[in-house]
Amino acid sequence: MKIVLANPRGFCAGVDRAISIVERALELYEAPIYVRHEVVHNRFVVEGLKQRGAIFVEELHEVPDDNIVIFSAHGVSQAVRKEAKERALTVFDATCPLVTKVHMEVARASKKNIEVVLIGHAGHPEVEGTMGQYASDSAGMYLVETPDDVIKLNVKDPSNLHYVSQTTLSVDETADVIDELRRVFPDIQGPRKDDICYATQNRQDAVRDMASQVDVMIVVGSKNSSNSNRLRELSEKLGTTSYLIDCPEDLKEEWLTDQAKVGVTAGASAPEELVNQIIEQVKAFGGTAVEELTGREENMFFEVPKELQIKTVS
């Protein structure tokens, strides 16, 4: 049984930056360091940071006074920022810069009293943070997930409308929603550049290229990872039986029985160390040669905050 590796796969620049922020804060300021929400949606990463002294909370009231708090890569609402400022908490912001770009689009529209439609999944922390950038009382912001949601949308002024999207969605499904928005609201405006992040796009393209070459697809990622779920869904849509797994123990031997080729990819929050562990498990179930496909080269890099760039405390 041949193992075929997607390329690119795994960590993106935003995830790298977010994890580095927590690691450097622990190095410079020592434990405990509080993190609002899982810094990235990967159980392996979160457990590793917990062992080093990071404490993950869902709300700021769980952070004691006079402590450091890190905002996760998914971003937070303006209300959360205001609360942190009022409590004089020391904040390091691990929000992905590509999410921040969407936040700025929403904030600009809000100041101009332009209504905004966000394409995204209800309940996802990125969506909650993005919705929380809108402050206009005279206009409104709306969340849609499917073309059917667009049909039901009742906006105040169809001629004064802008759309943005969650950064980790399915490229194809988002395009379908945008097409419906433009059909129903011909005057709607959108971002100059697609909000779907480069890493989400590249990993979906890699799965698209690989799905027809393998008999079964293993996607490495946590159940709460939006971009990992989209990879599994895309592979299934392309006709390849696919599974999302969090760790080597999740892999079932019967999935690989009588399969000639197994594809392996990973969501943007899954580390290569975990991918390697899962490859070893595939080998234990009969995997032999490993082939890594060629793919789009990624050289994106995001700096950590300057306060965390020093190596030692002076």
From Swiss-Prot:
Q: How is the cofactor bound?
A: Binds 1 [4Fe-4S] cluster per subunit.
| Family matches, as Pfam families | LYTB (PF02401)
Gene3D superfamilies per UniProt: 3.40.50.11270, 4-hydroxy-3-methylbut-2-enyl diphosphate reductase, catalytic domain (3.40.1010.20)
Cite the InterPro entries for this sequence.
LytB/IspH (IPR003451)
Where does this protein hold [4Fe-4S] cluster? 12, 96, 197
Q: Which residues form the signal peptide?
A: none
Report residues binding isopentenyl diphosphate: 41, 74, 124, 225-227, 269
Which EC number(s) does UniProt give?
A: 1.17.7.4
- One GO-annotated biological process of the protein: terpenoid biosynthetic process
UniProt keyword DNA-binding, yes or no: no
Q: In which pathway does it act?
A: Isoprenoid biosynthesis; dimethylallyl diphosphate biosynthesis; dimethylallyl diphosphate from (2E)-4-hydroxy-3-methylbutenyl diphosphate: step 1/1; Isoprenoid biosynthesis; isopentenyl diphosphate biosynthesis via DXP pathway; isopentenyl diphosphate from 1-deoxy-D-xylulose 5-phosphate: step 6/6
Q: Which GO terms describe its molecular function?
A: 4 iron, 4 sulfur cluster binding; 4-hydroxy-3-methylbut-2-enyl diphosphate reductase activity; metal ion binding
Active site residues according to the UniProt entry: 126
Q: Where does dimethylallyl diphosphate bind?
A: 41, 74, 124, 225-227, 269
Cofactor needs: [4Fe-4S] cluster
Cell inner membrane found in the keyword field: no
Query: What does the record list as coiled-coil region(s)?
Result: none
Q: Which residues bind (2E)-4-hydroxy-3-methylbut-2-enyl diphosphate?
A: 41, 74, 124, 167, 225-227, 269
What the record says about family reads: Belongs to the IspH family.
The function of this protein is: Catalyzes the conversion of 1-hydroxy-2-methyl-2-(E)-butenyl 4-diphosphate (HMBPP) into a mixture of isopentenyl diphosphate (IPP) and dimethylallyl diphosphate (DMAPP). Acts in the terminal step of the DOXP/MEP pathway for isoprenoid precursor biosynthesis.
Task: Spell out the NCBIfam families in the cross-references.
Answer: ispH_lytB, PRK01045.1-2, PRK01045.1-4
Q: What is this protein called?
A: 4-hydroxy-3-methylbut-2-enyl diphosphate reductase
Identify the species of origin: Aliivibrio fischeri (strain MJ11)
